[in-house]
């Protein structure tokens, strides 16, 4: 589950609900631990009692952004934090687009929930297509810049997904005994603001949200 660092309240809430329910339904949520969609998806997966994986663009001992050290520890306890870079490697900008190929490679399906036309999540989407992975995008407001990237993906053939069931239904037969939609009936969605706060992530319903320490 990937997307922009900036986000609208619509994008944040749908990201949280979908990642939460995907985790309950048996999916492992993979993302990059960045601000915005990445951290929301990881926190939601943990709240859903599921597994989550974070792929870093830095050394394993250099968590970036630093505000997500607490979240990184939570991810490690519920899945894994991994990187191809040696310890001590700083988070240079060029590392993140390269890192995105690993996120796509580890995934059976990639969901982009919020993206401008310049979002790095579109790089992950291109890797997913090149690797033959399922590609989903969340439809949004066509005049919102944070939805222009997802609109582009939909025009280029990505599947529309507005809830976790859209993805789980498509993969239930491929993962028998793992994907289970009935679990969604037993577990209501956790409260987003409270869950994000427990991971050290501030949410104020803005398009750009300063993260707490």
Can you name each region flagged by the protein language model?
Residues 2-213:
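Glycine-biased, small-residue-rich flexible motifs in mid-sequence functional cores and linkers
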């Amino acid at each position: 589950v990937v997307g922009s660092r900036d986000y609208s309240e619509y994008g944040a809430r749908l990201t949280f609900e979908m990642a939460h329910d995907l985790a309950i339904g048996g999916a492992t949520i993979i993302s990059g631990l960045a601000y915005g969609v990445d951290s929301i998806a990881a926190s939601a997966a943990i709240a859903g009692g599921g597994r989550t994986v974070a792929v870093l663009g830095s050394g394993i001992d250099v968590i970036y952004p630093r505000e997500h050290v607490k979240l990184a520890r939570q991810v490690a306890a519920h899945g894994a934090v991994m990187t191809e870079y040696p310890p001590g490697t700083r988070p240079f900008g060029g590392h993140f687009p390269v890192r995105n190929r690993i996120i796509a490679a580890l995934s059976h399906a990639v969901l982009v929930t919020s993206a401008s036309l310049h979002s790095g999540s579109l790089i992950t989407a291109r890797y997913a297509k090149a690797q033959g992975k399922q590609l989903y995008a969340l439809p949004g407001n066509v005049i919102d810049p944070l939805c222009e990237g997802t609109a582009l993906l939909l025009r280029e053939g990505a599947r529309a997904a507005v809830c976790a069931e859209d993805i789980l239904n498509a993969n239930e037969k491929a993962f028998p005994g793992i994907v289970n939609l009935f679990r969604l009936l037993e577990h209501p969605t956790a409260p987003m603001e409270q869950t994000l706060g427990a991971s050290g992530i501030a949410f104020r319903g803005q398009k750009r949200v300063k993260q707490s320490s």
